[in-house]
A protein has these predicted regions:
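Structured loops at beta-to-helix junctions and adjacent beta-edge loops in soluble globular domains
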Residues: 11, 28-30, 283, 317, ...
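Conserved N-terminal alpha-helix of the aminotransferase class I/II PLP-enzyme fold
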Residues: 30, 35-87, 109-117
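Conserved PLP-binding catalytic core of the aspartate aminotransferase-like
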Residues: 313-344
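Glycine-centered tight turns that cap/initiate beta-strands
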Residues: 72, 143, 310-313
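Conserved PLP-enzyme active-site core in the AAT-like
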Residues: 9, 13-16, 76-307
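N-terminal glycine-rich, Lys/His-bearing helix-loop that initiates the first secondary-structure elements
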Residues: 1-50, 335
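Short glycine-enriched loop/turn motifs at secondary-structure junctions
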Residues: 46, 70-71, 210, 334-336
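A short acidic, often aromatic-flanked loop/helix-cap motif at beta-alpha or helix-coil junctions
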Residues: 33, 132-136, 322-323
Length: 344
C-alpha cells in the first residue's frame, strides 16, 4: 500500500455492523463481555479485545494502526498529547536510578521534562550535542535506558544523523527513541535508519488543522528485550502490577508497546478521547499533500529571507548553504519540513 493510500485506509475495514465507510467515533467508556470468563480473559490479556477506553478504544485503535503503518512499526499507542507520549515512552523503560542520554537540541517542553521533571522521579538526563558522537558514547553507562533525539529539531531545524546514533545505541544495547514530529513519516521513517521507538506530537503536522491535541508512541518491534534482559528485566520477568504478565512471552516483538499501554497509560490515565482520535484521522488523510506544500512554502520563504539585507542567517536544512544539508539529503530526502528560523 502506498504511503498516501495508507494514510487514508490503513487500520480500518468497513464496520461489520453498520457498514460505515468512514471510521466511526466509538464515544463509550466501557464494553460488554460475553460472560464472566470472557471478562476475566480480557483483563488478564489472554485474549484480544476492549476493556475500558482509558486503555483502548476502537476509534483510537484505527489511529494507532494507521500511524504504525506509516512509520513501519509493529504497533502504536495514541495518547492525550505529545508530551504524554514522550513521558510514557520513557516511564515504560526507566525507574529511579536510571538515566537517558539526549541531544541538547530539543523542543522546549521536552527539555523541561528532561531537565526538571524526570529528575524528580529519580531519572537523570545527560545532554550532549547532537553531532558529538564521542560525548554520546561517553555518557552511556550501565544505568542508561535510552538514547533520545529529534529527527528534525524543533525549533532549531537541525537534522540528526539517525544512522550514527542508532549504531551507538546498538553497540551499547539500548533503544534509540526518535521524536519524528517535525519530519513526519512522509519525510523520514526513523526505523529505516536503525531507530527502535518513535514518538509524535500528533497535534502538529499529522493533525494539521490546529483543532486537536494528541500524541503517539510507535514500536519498531526490533529491539531484542530478551537479549538485553539484564538491562531491561521488566520485559522478561513477571510484572506484579498486571497479573504477572511477562511481556516478551505474551506479546513477542510488541512487548514494549504493550507495556506502554498497560503500565503508564493504565496507571496514570493520559488517554486520548475517541473524538480527538477521529479528528486526527481526518488530518492524517491529507498528510502527503500538506507536507509537499509545507516544504515548498518553507523553502521559498527561506530563500527570500537569505536575500534580505537585514537577515544575517537563515536556519533551514534544505538550503544549499545549511550545515545540515547533507544529512537532510540522507535522512529526509533533501526536504526539511515547515519549521525555519532566522537571525537579524
Amino acid at each position: 500500500m502506498k504511503f498516501s493510500t495508507a494514510a487514508i485506509h490503513a487500520g480500518y475495514h468497513s464496520d461489520p455492523t453498520t457498514r460505515a465507510a468512514a471510521v466511526p467515533v466509538y464515544q463509550t467508556t466501557s464494553y460488554t463481555f460475553d460472560d464472566s470468563q470472557h471478562g476475566a480473559d480480557l483483563f488478564n490479556l489472554a485474549v484480544p479485545g476492549n476493556i475500558y477506553t482509558r486503555i483502548m478504544n476502537p476509534t483510537n485503535a484505527v489511529l494507532e494502526a494507521r500511524v504504525a503503518a506509516l512509520e513501519g512499526g509493529v504497533g502504536a499507542l495514541a495518547l492525550a498529547s505529545g508530551m504524554t507520549a514522550i513521558t510514557y515512552a520513557l516511564q515504560a523503560l526507566c525507574s529511579p536510578g536510571s538515566n537517558i542520554v539526549s541531544t541538547s537540541q530539543l523542543y522546549g517542553g521536552t527539555y523541561n521534562l528532561f531537565a526538571h521533571s524526570l529528575p524528580n522521579q529519580g531519572i537523570q538526563c545527560r545532554f550532549v550535542d547532537h553531532d558529538d558522537l564521542e560525548a554520546l558514547e561517553a555518557a552511556i553507562d550501565d544505568n542508561t535506558r535510552a538514547l533520545y533525539c529529534e529527527s528534525i529539531g524543533n525549533p532549531a531545524g537541525n537534522v540528526v544523523d539517525l544512522k550514527r546514533w542508532a549504531e551507538v545505541a546498538e553497540r551499547h544495547g539500548v533503544p534509540l527513541i526518535v521524536d519524528n514530529t517535525v519530519a513526519t513519516p512522509y519525510l523520514c521513517r526513523p526505523f529505516e535508519h536503525g531507530a527502535h521507538i518513535v514518538v509524535h506530537s500528533l497535534t502538529k503536522y499529522i493533525g494539521g488543522h490546529g483543532t486537536t491535541i494528541g500524541g503517539a508512541i510507535v514500536d519498531s518491534g526490533r529491539f531484542d528485550w530478551k537479549k538485553h534482559a539484564r538491562r531491561f528485566p521488566i520485559f522478561s520477568q513477571p510484572d506484579p502490577s498486571y497479573h504477572g504478565v511477562v511481556y516478551t512471552d505474551s506479546f513477542g516483538e510488541a512487548a514494549y508497546i504493550a507495556r506502554c499501554r498497560v503500565v503508564p497509560l493504565r496507571n496514570t490515565g493520559g488517554a486520548l478521547s475517541p473524538f480527538n482520535a477521529f479528528m486526527l484521522l481526518q488530518g492524517l488523510e491529507t498528510l502527503s499533500l500538506r507536507m509537499e506544500r509545507h516544504c515548498s512554502n518553507a523553502l521559498q520563504v527561506a530563500q527570500w529571507l537569505e536575500k534580505h539585507p537585514k537577515v544575517t542567517r537563515v536556519n533551514y536544512a534544505a538550503l544549499p548553504g545549511s550545515p545540515y544539508r547533507e544529512t537532510a539529503e540522507r535522512i529526509c530526502g533533501g526536504r526539511a519540513s515547515g519549521i525555519l528560523s532566522f537571525e537579524l
